[in-house]
């Protein structure tokens, strides 16, 4: 049984806005560049490079891009579930937004997940689940 399961993962430019919404899984977003505002519950966060947002299941959130002439919002995004109750609770306690001491490892793990997913070689899902699990454990430590 996987301790965590990736539902979707990608690196993209967001040039649209979404309204406050929630879902029944976690979502982790890393900001690579751009401007805008992320709303989590009633709290607005001005977007900064190398921020990480950890959105919990059923948590209201929205992403609004910056001005039309501003640099596009480039993000890393993974949507996932967590089966392990202890890890689930630890992730809930992390907080909505944080900065990592080394954002580079975060980007490298995302790139490995994306590359492995694109190739879909045998056992790729076990590998990407392992990468995500390592990311999550590093974050909650």
Language-model features, listed with the residues they occupy:
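Amphipathic alpha-helical segments enriched in hydrophobic/aromatic residues interleaved with Lys/Arg
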Residues: 89-139
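N-terminal regulatory/effector-sensing and dimerization cores
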Residues: 8-93, 122-126
